[in-house]
Amino acid sequence: MLSRLQELRKEEETLLRLKAALHDQLNRLKVEELALQSMINSRGRTETLSSQPAPEQLCDMSLHVDNEVTINQTTLKLSTRSPMEEEEEEEEEEEEEEESDS
């Protein structure tokens, strides 16, 4: 019973770290979205002021926008635990199993 409680506490800690990491990522994405919307709006205003935007503006905008293909190919890493933590936990579980078998 006690080991199950410890296991649940570790799982809770992991989930809380994951929640924090996802919250941070969501905030970064919101900031990026606002920046992109701002660039789109400024491009729209520029196009209404002049029929053809200056080549320098187009080049400058393209430097700040992320490559969509690269973003889509990026894998999302949700693990908040290091491989060392996982190995330590596995070793602890093995030790607990050995103790309970004895």
Swiss-Prot record:
GO biological process: snRNA transcription by RNA polymerase II; snRNA transcription by RNA polymerase III; transcription initiation at RNA polymerase III promoter
Region named Disordered: 73-102
Pfam families hit by this protein: SNAPC5
Entry's localization field: Nucleus
InterPro entries reported in the protein's UniProt record: SNAPC5
Known role: Part of the SNAPc complex required for the transcription of both RNA polymerase II and III small-nuclear RNA genes. Binds to the proximal sequence element (PSE), a non-TATA-box basal promoter element common to these 2 types of genes. Recruits TBP and BRF2 to the U6 snRNA TATA box.
Name of the protein described by the UniProt record: snRNA-activating protein complex subunit 5
Organism: Mus musculus
